[in-house]
Amino acid sequence: MKLDNIKRVGIILRPSTPELKDMFLEAKRIFESRGIEVSIDHISGGMIDVMGQPFDLLCRNSDFLVTIGGDGTLISAVRRSYEYQIPVLGIHAGKLGFLADLDFSELESFVDDLIAGEYRIDERAMLQATITTKHGESSVVAFNDIVLTRPSISKMIRLETYVDGRTFNTYYGDGVVISTPTGSTAYNLSAGGPVLFPLTHVFALTPICPHSLTQRPVVLPGHFEIEIKTPDASALVIVDGQDMVEITDNDTVHIKLADGGAHLIHRKEFNYFEVLKEKLGWGN
């Protein structure tokens, strides 16, 4: 994927952070001084007293999106813009992020690189979950992970798991994390799951505090599908730590890699392993 003849960009700011107004105005100046029209989504605009556009309209009218904030801001923008398959550039307003890896001080020079074609767009896998309950069916997408966990801390949860239609395992514990390669360094890593290179087409199934020490993480190929049932209790389905659905006994969740993905804009010299070393403190 390439950005040809860039004319319009849409900006999303981290919520509840009105102090980002100065960054927005500076970003607007940088883009507009190079002939690129700038718009902002209406929630971000309302936060800083600037006229904005509804998010769907912003996606339709922009060549790419820019998030200013942190990884959470970028994850939200990627999920909300999924149907448009629009590239996203993440700028961190604070500490370096795994995803929002461009420092704001680098923006002006990077915009020149964008115009010159000196950049890269990485396609990252996403998850799609179909949740079937007594009340109907709903579908969600996730960029990092989908977590099934117990609604109460007082007892374990039992999750029956099927892989490609065949019985695989019954997990007893606090739940499971189903993670994309991008999300493998989030909850998955804390739960003892593996680090997956973000451009691979696989996903991980990792138990959370399992009752049996033989329950270990599993990496599955991208064409597989997982089905999870809660046979005798309710559970929470948490999507990227941002949305939550409660399911009850015998409801099902089907999870697979989504047909589309996320398209992240990076500097041409972006190196995932350098970010990994920085964030995890490796090699220091």
Functional labels for PLM-detected ranges:
Residues 96-174:
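Catalytic core of DAGKc-family lipid kinases
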Residues 71-73, 94-96, 182-184:
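Short glycine-rich anion-binding loops that position phosphate/pyrophosphate groups of nucleotides
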Residues 37, 85-87:
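Proline-centered loop/turn at the N-terminus of a beta-strand
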Residues 1-64, 68, 105-120, 131-140:
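ATP/NTP phosphate-donor binding region
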Residues 20, 72-77, 185-189:
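Short glycine/serine/threonine-rich phosphate/pyrophosphate-binding segments
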Residues 161, 183, 237:
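Short aromatic-centered micro-motifs
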Residues 169-214:
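Gly/Ser/Thr-rich active-site loops/lids in small-molecule metabolic enzymes
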Residues 148, 164-167, 215-284:
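ATP/nucleoside-binding phosphotransfer catalytic cores, i.e., glycine-rich phosphate-binding loops
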